[in-house]
Amino acid sequence: MALTRLLIKDFRNIESADLALAAGFNFLVGPNGSGKTSVLEAVYTLGHGRAFRSLQAGRVIRHECAEFVLHGRVDANEREASVGLSKSRQGDTKVRIDGTDGHKVAELAQMLPMQLITPEGFTLLNGGPKFRRAFLDWGCFHNEPGFFTAWSNLKRLLKQRNAALRQVSRYTQIRAWDQEIIPLAERISEWRAAYSDAIAADISATCALFLPEFALSFSFQRGWDKESDYGELLARQFERDRALTYTAVGPHKADFRIRADGTPVEDLLSRGQLKLLMCALRLAQGEFLTRQSGRRCLYLLDDFASELDTGRRRLLAERLKATQAQVFVSAVSAEQVADMVGEKGKMFRVEHGKIEVQPQD
């Protein structure tokens, strides 16, 4: 799975770019503010329908332009596909696949599985549970065909239930929602639990390589007491939910807890160690997908050198090379990515939103 070509129009500070990409490493080098991260964000947006630095379309559309347009050629298991995405300032989104309109963003996400590693990505480890739920849900989305529909339906039903809690006085008035919510909640929790169990060995092996000085443990918390029946719990907690005006327990409260030597990792590890752990989790997840389905992720690394010394950068470079996946890496200087440069790599110089191929010695 790789992007062979990327066209960018009116995205962030990039007016226009047409990039022929390497199947291996693609390095984006240039000073801060030059547009390196914008290229990474364009790749990410093509696969997700939204940018990773802003959820508002207007903020990523170039100044005084009506929309951004992204287009890519995808080499997927010896089959080439064409994908496109445009978004207007009003939020209108158009997805095109192989020349036809009317497709969903979820189809792009399925075609272009990506792992994003950014300085803001520490939230996976020291942010709230929603970031770790997203980690599990990425895996479930790519491994369970019914997950996306089930999770979308559950979110819709929970939103309706929460709205109803503001208006009802008896549990019987919201029982109809619970009858739909309960089977979805149980199925989603089963998928998440199965995925966390299945990927545990990959995570442990990768973490042992990156952080051998710590004994790391991982546990999935489904969002309600494991000894309780979810339906009975919803009925029992109705008055509390009504007072709160939201549903306090369920898969929307799940977590994937990570400890080092029995202590929450955010309380023990340095920033450099947290970045290594974040990279280990992303790599393990990508490698698990490859083993399960034969598909390879695209890895996007922004500000590669931050928080990592030379030895750790070299270790990460070796692991990324071993995946044989397509990798996009931004750095301030070519020296920072010297350990990654190889015959399958391509170097791009980015300045003021202009992108040029830079010859490698």
UniProtKB/Swiss-Prot annotation:
Ligand binding (ATP): G30, P31, N32, G33, S34, G35, K36, T37
Keyword DNA damage: yes
Cell location: Cytoplasm
PROSITE patterns: RECF_1 (PS00617), RECF_2 (PS00618)
This protein's record includes keyword S-adenosyl-L-methionine: no
Gene Ontology molecular function terms on file: ATP binding; single-stranded DNA binding
GO cellular component, one term: cytoplasm
Pfam families: SMC_N (PF02463)
Keyword annotations from UniProtKB, A to Z: ATP-binding, Cytoplasm, DNA damage, DNA repair, DNA replication, DNA-binding, Nucleotide-binding, SOS response
GO BP terms in the entry: DNA replication; DNA synthesis involved in DNA repair; double-strand break repair; SOS response
InterPro entries with a match to the protein in the record: DNA-binding_RecF, DNA-binding_RecF_CS, P-loop_NTPase, RecF/RecN/SMC_N, RecF_2
Job of this protein: The RecF protein is involved in DNA metabolism; it is required for DNA replication and normal SOS inducibility. RecF binds preferentially to single-stranded, linear DNA. It also seems to bind ATP.
Similarity comment text for this entry: Belongs to the RecF family.
Protein name (record): DNA replication and repair protein RecF
Originating organism: Yersinia pestis
